[in-house]
Amino acid sequence: MTNKTSLSYKDAGVDIDAGNDLVDRIKGVVKQTRRPEVMGGLGGFGALCALPQKYREPILVSGTDGVGTKLRLAMDLKRHDTIGIDLVAMCVNDLVVQGAEPLFFLDYFATGKLDVDTAASVITGIAEGCKQSGCALVGGETAEMPGMYHGDDYDVAGFCVGVVEKSEIIDGSKVTPGDVLVALGASGPHSNGYSLVRKILDVSNTNPEQTSLEGKSLADHLLEPTKIYVKSILSLIEQLDIHAIAHLTGGGFWENIPRVLPQGMQAVIDEASWQWPAVFSWLQHAGNVSRHEMYRTFNCGVGMVVALPAELADKAVELLTASGEKAWKIGVIAAATEGAEQVIINP
């Protein structure tokens, strides 16, 4: 009889003990995100959450997203502490533009070999994003998959569910000519356009940690977490009649603003109403990127655009500013002729 070595899951590259250590490490930060509607804690087969009692006709709103190749930049620079904020932001910002209050969030973290310190850093960032948006982190999946990822590489995805009163859903149907567009400033490129960012860094032979812009490194500018607008927008919605909100993500101005415009409507943007933050000017110059491509790829300093009646625009700017946002009137809604562009950016 031949003696054979007894193999374990750990021999195959999956360390269950490391996974358990990770859960123990993150329990405290996860607990800080708890909402009263959440039933139970981590470790169940599924997470239970009641609907807030204030809703008469609650409609659930769901979303899922990742952070694109911003994650590659974060891994290359070994900065894992804020990418989780980006992950939450990309999901909850998509929910709030429809008037929804985020309720709970789940994450998916996949890697070839689990580094507990890295994973804990990422998930701590996710918990921070949940706190900023008033959302409970109710669970997630940590997948250690040998042979699927190179070295210490990992990927993340997020899933969020929110709730909105049926009569208060914001879907753009109320947008009308004469509405004013109010912009909310972005914290940076947020989580979009990073394949182009990385190409520009490569072609221009730029080390982002050794390049300075306005007193901080280019790396800091590029890895600045995506701004979470949930609390500011929910507060605005409670006080004013909002007709539409666009979250400027992949596709920039040209593709995201039309998503909330009815047929026959056109957004006319005044480019002179704001100055691009330095990081966007640097990217355009270093990559010789056309103006059209900049507005197609990046937010160029505008994270969200709100459409509302003209007589409420000044009040909206005032309220958003009081909430800590940089806000300004960026344009108007006009009637569009058949076949006309839905977004015009006037220099």
From Swiss-Prot:
Coding gene?
purM
BP GO annotations: 'de novo' IMP biosynthetic process; adenine biosynthetic process
Q: Which organism is it from?
A: Yersinia pseudotuberculosis serotype O:3 (strain YPIII)
Query: What PANTHER family does UniProt report for this protein, alphabetically?
Result: TRIFUNCTIONAL PURINE BIOSYNTHETIC PROTEIN ADENOSINE-3, TRIFUNCTIONAL PURINE BIOSYNTHETIC PROTEIN ADENOSINE-3-RELATED
Query: What does the similarity note say?
Result: Belongs to the AIR synthase family.
Pathway, per Swiss-Prot/TrEMBL? Purine metabolism; IMP biosynthesis via de novo pathway; 5-amino-1-(5-phospho-D-ribosyl)imidazole from N(2)-formyl-N(1)-(5-phospho-D-ribosyl)glycinamide: step 2/2
Q: What class of enzyme is it?
A: ligase
Q: What is its EC number?
A: 6.3.3.1
- Residue spans crossing the bilayer: none
Reaction it catalyzes: 2-formamido-N(1)-(5-O-phospho-beta-D-ribosyl)acetamidine + ATP = 5-amino-1-(5-phospho-beta-D-ribosyl)imidazole + ADP + phosphate + H(+)
Q: Which NCBIfam families match?
A: purM (TIGR00878)
Name of the molecule in the record: Phosphoribosylformylglycinamidine cyclo-ligase
Q: One cellular component GO annotation, for this chain's record?
A: cytosol
